[in-house]
Amino acid sequence: NTINTIMINTINNKVFRNANEAYEYLHDQILQYGVSFGDTKALFNVGFYITDPKDRKIINRERKWSEEYAEAEWQWYLSGDRNIKKLGEIYGKVPEIWKRMADPFGHVNSNYGWQWQRDAQLDMVVEMLKHNPDTRQACISIYDGKEITDYAFDTPCTYAVQFTIVHGRLDMCVTMRSNDLWYGFC
């Protein structure tokens, strides 16, 4: 029964020291309990916490993951420019995956940076936290259902991000519709 399988596979509030610990655990869980969708295996309702998010290096030689590229992609997001040309300027080239996902004008709708900056959401979150560190309303909405036809090839994986200050430390809760553990988890 698929529903029972999904319920059994629910991982909630697991605590990991770093990204590598989380990656290894989730990788094993997907292989063991993942529900198949074509060439994809998935776990549902996965919730976890990483105590040291700065320790984000994942040790998997087969993954061929580039820290240099990840940093360039992050800088592209922060720029707020959704055109793949900007990524090319930062990284030195535009990876093929982004060329395939871009619209005819070179725009990528799943570039989170332009979504964060839409309606000055990121600025608003910063101001909210400065004025009321106890707020639970400091959220950024990324996915907009009204834009579903615009997303075509590049529906954002992240729906929303909530920022809270807990014990004097900034915490971030990310809600996603999907996450590619192999390439997108870092």
Where on the chain are the PLM-derived regions?
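Terminal, non-catalytic protein-protein interaction segments that mediate quaternary/complex assembly
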Residues: 4-186
